[in-house]
A protein has these predicted regions:
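Short edge beta-strand/loop segments characteristic of extracellular beta-sandwich folds
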Residues: 236-242, 356-362, 494-498, 566-574
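Short, compositionally biased P/S/T/A/G/V-rich stretches that sit at domain boundaries
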Residues: 182-230, 240, 326-356, 541-562
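Long, low-complexity serine/threonine/glycine- and acidic-rich segments characteristic of extracellular
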Residues: 152, 192, 207-333, 376, ...
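Proteolytic processing hotspots in large secreted/extracellular or virion-associated proteins
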Residues: 430-441, 463-511, 554-556
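Surface-exposed loop/turn motifs at beta-strand-loop junctions within extracellular Ig-like
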Residues: 158, 176, 241, 314-318, ...
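Proteolytic-maturation and junctional protease-sensitive modules
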Residues: 485-535, 580-592
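Surface-exposed, glycine-biased beta-strand/turn segments
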Residues: 16-116, 144-147, 152-153, 162-170, ...
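A short beta-turn/strand-edge loop motif at beta-sheet boundaries
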Residues: 227-229, 245-252, 356-369, 486-489, ...
Length: 639
């Protein structure tokens, strides 16, 4: 249900790069001299989707975890039913309905040859009649049509909504062909954005030594380096853009350029993307545990040298520019700590694509012991052997190359949640050139985890030990297993969790939603195995809470472009949701009724004219993602 050169970093591994790296797309190089305060790049507005202004809430190329955002999103002020106008003369190439992803989506083929995509619609206007006809002919809720209906520029095409994923908004996408998409802003689409991009932080590293600098210090012209007067440094910048106040929706940037004195050493302009290269997002935007907080960490694949002055220039899609000038120093005045984790309780996590170990927790009463591959104790007090601060796990393996486990313990008063902890982190030392891994780890309490990983990206420059880790984390509702470093786009990750005391199904954790999803394909029994193309947190979950339906109620929704009565029924579940719209069947007196499933906020929607009279019954059968069939009988309320 979810979906990179590959990710440039492992814990201590960096890919080779050119000294001068330029990746300019449509607009190309904006000049070889050091940046001025402004540049002339204001594409005249030639198309506004609505009959009124609307601000951006998501920009082109934004980080979507395992892919880039292929279009732009407009706010509709949490309202549905805004008429959307045709950008040019053309025909409706295709319309589709689905409870997920794009929801109700229209593909409009313009005379220019471009395909304009309008997603999350509430209504296709007059084309709703064709949709309804196909649904009732096939008894399927999710359908696809190719109407080929002509429209002229400025005609009302469709109506905004909230189908698929997200609150009410319009997703606009422009496809040049089957592989390439272009930013609508480049084509003259309205892109209202009144705030220049923000640089929240920077990071400089060499091998397993990392230094992070806050925005306050960077604004004063200083960036902290972890090593003094040494070459072979690497740089990442945490950046976000906002379109307006309040700053609710962090967005991506269009252009990022870096100069060393007056030499441009890096340039990235994002005006086009390729579907075939969408996973390159892991290449440019480094994975961190706080991946859903404001800003992305942009990796700069250019060698950073000491004793040099650097200029950074960042531009958004409306032409607003932010510039910073800095030099490298061992310390910076005004530097503040940077948040590296979110929703994280275990001492091991991923930051900038590296596996990190939080030895700062020693100060709270945690104890760490390192054991070797022959179960020998390498140190029973890592808190005394190493500085009590956050470090890369690779740095620990540098001192203890035969380490196999790091055991950590803490009393109930030390953990902060009133529960004592006694767990261990299984660690694996991988060479920078090792592309495949077979690794078996015993995490105690009868749990063994086996991983077979193929197609790991190869680090070409850095020979520092590369650290991988897995540990168990306890929460109030369940225990799950964390795998690090995240953000690796692999050929295949096969993971098996063996626990004779828990033979429940295997689930994976959504990166930003924090929801659990069952693996579609997995083995059964005490050894549960599943596959993915990147590391995920997983859990063995026995779902004993069946899906239920809330009280039905009448509301209004847009049908054929007009607000009309609909019956809405809340859907309640903890783990196993609805796989697709066709997993739902509704009947009244044995007569099939079309159902729309709104995945946010989890409601079934039935057209009012198709619902029987008040007091009569509707039978609804839902197949959930775990293949459980749920049957409900509801009574139609008074309108």
């Amino acid at each position: 249900m979810r979906q990179f050169l590959f990710l440039l970093l492992l814990a201590g591994g960096v890919f080779a790069s050119e000294d001068n790296f330029t990746e300019d797309l449509i607009f190309g190089d904006t000049g070889s001299n050091a940046p001025k305060n402004e540049i002339a790049r204001n594409t005249p507005v030639s198309y506004s989707p609505f009959e009124k202004d609307a601000y951006l809430t998501s920009s082109f190329g934004e980080n979507r975890g395992t892919r880039y955002h292929a279009g732009i999103d407009y706010s509709t002020n949490m309202e549905e039913g805004w008429p959307i106008l045709a950008p040019e003369d053309g025909r409706v190439k295709e319309i589709r309905t689905s409870p997920f992803g794009y929801g109700k989506v229209m593909l409009y083929q313009g005379k220019s040859g471009k395909t304009w995509v309008f997603a999350h619609q509430s209504s296709f206007g007059k084309l709703d009649i064709q949709v309804r006809k196909k649904q009732y002919a096939t008894h399927k809720n999710d359908v696809k049509l190719t109407p080929n209906t002509p429209y002229a520029k400025g005609d009302t095409l469709t109506f905004s909504g909230s189908t698929g994923i997200g609150n009410p908004h319009l997703h606009l996408e422009v496809r040049l062909d089957k592989d390439r998409v272009v930013s609508p802003c480049v084509l003259g689409a309205l892109c209202l954005d009144t705030i220049a991009p923000q640089i929240f932080a920077g990071a400089i590293w060499q091998g397993n030594s990392i230094a992070v600098t806050s925005a306050e210090a960077i604004e004063k012209g200083c960036m902290v380096t972890p090593v003094k007067n040494e070459f072979g440094l690497y740089l990442a910048l945490k950046i976000a853009d906002y379109s307006r106040e309040p700053k609710d929706n962090p967005m991506a940037i269009r252009r990022l350029e870096v100069w060393r004195y007056d030499e441009k050493i890096y340039s990235k302009v994002v005006d086009t993307l390729r579907y075939s290269k969408m996973t390159d997002v892991r290449n440019e935007l480094l994975w961190t545990e706080e991946a859903d907080t404001a800003g992305d960490w942009h990796y700069i694949p250019a060698k950073i040298a000491p004793l040099s002055k650097y200029t950074i220039e960042v531009e958004d899609f409306a032409g607003n520019i932010t510039k910073r000038v800095f030099t490298l120093h061992p310390k910076c005045n005004g530097n503040k700590p940077i948040t590296q984790v979110k929703n994280q309780t275990a001492p091991v996590y991923t930051f900038l694509g590296k596996t990190m170990l939080n030895l700062f927790m020693c100060r709270s009463g945690y104890n760490f012991k390192v054991t070797g591959d022959k179960d020998e104790v390498l140190t029973d007090d890592l808190c005394s052997a190493m500085p009590q601060k956050i470090t890369t796990l690779g740095r620990v393996l540098q001192d203890y190359p035969t380490a196999k486990y790091i055991e950590y313990t803490a009393s109930a008063s030390s953990t902060g949640d009133g529960k004592a902890v006694d767990e261990k982190i299984a660690v694996f030392r991988r060479t920078p050139y090792q592309t495949n891994v077979n690794w078996k780890a015993d995490l105690g309490n009868g749990t063994t985890i086996t991983q077979k990983i193929t197609g790991i990206p190869v680090a070409k420059l850095d020979s520092t030990p590369i650290a991988m880790a897995v540990t168990r984390t306890h929460t109030d509702s369940l225990d799950f297993f964390e795998f690090h470093p995240k953000g690796l786009q692999l050929k295949k990750w096969n993971v098996c969790v063996e626990n004779k005391n828990n033979m429940a199904a295997l689930y994976w954790l959504g990166e930003t939603s924090r929801d659990w999803f069952i693996f579609d394909k997995q083995t059964k029994g005490k050894n549960r195995c599943a596959s993915a193309n990147e590391l995920r947190d997983v859990a063995l979950i026995l779902n004993e809470e069946p899906m239920s339906l809330g009280f039905p109620y009448w509301a209004n929704s847009y049908i054929e472009g007009i607000s009309q009565p609909v019956l809405k029924i809340p859907v309640v579940y903890k783990y196993d949701g609805i796989a697709n719209g066709n997993a739902i069947t509704a009947k009244a007196k044995n007569k099939w009724i079309a159902v729309e499933y709104d995945s946010e906020p989890r409601e079934l929607v039935l057209e009012g004219t198709k619902v029987p009279d008040a007091g009569e019954e509707i039978t609804i059968i839902i197949m959930d993602e775990a293949k459980h069939k749920n049957k409900f009988v509801i009574t139609v309320p008074e309108i």
